[in-house]
C-alpha cells in the first residue's frame, strides 16, 4: 500500500512538472511570436505583419496581437498607423475592431469625428469668414461641442509604404492645410481650410501616444513636419487659432496631443 501511495505521488509530481514546462514553453513561444510581429511592423514589412496577425487570430492567439498593439502605442510608434491601415484594407478589419482602440476604427472607416486638443479641451473648427483665396482660418472652438462646425473625417492615402490623411471638414467641405509662410517670431505656421487637396500641405500623418490611460494622437503635416496645435491667445469668442508647431512634440503629449472622438 505504501508503494502505491509513493508511486501515485511520483506520477502527480511528474504530471505537474510536465504541465509547468508546457505552460512555460507556450509563454516563451508566444513571446517570440510577439517579437516577430512587432519587428515586422517596425521594419515596415506590413504585408508580413498582416499575414502573421490573420494567422494568430485564426489560431486563437489574439493576445499576441493585443500585446503588440499596446506596446506600439506605448512606444509612440508611427508605424502603428500603417499596420492598422494595412489590416483595414487587407481582410483584417475584424482584427482592428477587436484589438485596436476605438479611435483607430473611426479614423480608418472615415467616420465623422471631433478633434479635441487635450491641453485646452477645445474642438477644432474652421472659421466662418473666407479670405480672398477662399480659405478659412482654423480655430479651437471656445464654446461649441456638438454642432457640425466641428465635424471632420479622415481620408486615407497610401504612398511609399506610408499612410497619410486628408482631414476634411464636413461643414464647409474644405481640407485642413498648413501655410507656406512662418511667423517671424515663433516660426509657427497658420492653418487654413481650403477647397482643394492636391499638395502635401493638405496631407497629414498621425503618431499615437498614451497619456493618463487615454489614447491620443500627434497630428503632423506631411510637407513641413509641423505638429497641429492651438495657440495660447484667446480671442473675444473664447477661440484659439490653430498652428503648425515648429519643434519637437513627442515628449509632451499633455500639451500637443489630440483626442479623436465620435461626432
Swiss-Prot record:
Pfam short name (any one): Lipoprotein_11
The protein's name in its UniProt record: Low molecular mass lipoprotein 4
Tissues expressed in: Detected in larval hemolymph (at protein level).
Endpoints of the signal sequence: 1-23
Keyword terms of this UniProt record: Lipoprotein, Secreted, Signal
Location in the cell: Secreted
Gene Ontology cellular component list: extracellular region
Gene3D superfamilies reported in the protein's UniProt record: 2.80.10.50, Lepidopteran low molecular weight (30 kD) lipoprotein, N-terminal domain (1.10.10.2400)
InterPro entries: Lipoprotein_11, Lipoprotein_11_N
Chief site of localization: secreted
UniProt similarity note: Belongs to the 30 kDa lipoprotein family.
Note: This lipoprotein belongs to the group of structurally related '30 kDa proteins' that comprise major protein components of the fifth (and last) instar larvae and of pupae.
Domain of life: Eukaryota
